[in-house]
Amino acid sequence: FGTHIELLEMCELKAYREEVSDGELKRKLDEFYDKFNVEASCSSEELVRAARTSVALDKLVNVHQLGAMAYYYEGFCGNDYENIVTSVIAGNTLLTGYGIPVAGECEVKNAQAMKIMSLLKAGGSFSEFYAMDFKDDIVLLGHYGPAHFAIAEEKVKLVPLPLYHGKPGKGLSIQMSVKPGDVTLLSVCEGRDGVFLLAAEGEAV
């Protein structure tokens, strides 16, 4: 693809996070309430934590002129970096919706596939296969990380998770259902002869 990759540092994101002003924080919280259906169970502390991280992510993207991002980080024993990484989902979802797709699990190829779908105005949201019912020809897919507003059936919900699955900590996450209709799955793959695209078509029901 000729992709230029920047290796980003958590300490840089932390520095931007510490510089967030009260005005920036208020504007980001207003953006949350505009873009998300914020569940009443979301605490003000978690909303502020996620909003502060979202502002920092915006700055990181602008400074490095990022067109997409892939990340993975766990942190350690509740340290500052864990506090950051457990509050990124809301901000990453906003970036994804604004054409800067963000993929978890440090999946660079997935971020590239999301970028292609975004440029085609087809959304682009990381998803994982959960189960396949060959008898009824049904595939179950889902994910609890960042998503894309364009494929949501209703306004995307912002909800609290008391415990993250597969990683430490807790924080805000999003909930959405894919709108019924035609869907396209796209993967960027690499084989013996180089990079290729793998696509599938289906229907969301």
Residue ranges and their predicted role:
Residues 1-83:
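A charged, amphipathic alpha-helical module
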Residues 49-205:
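Anaerobic metallocofactor- and corrinoid-dependent redox/one-carbon enzyme cores
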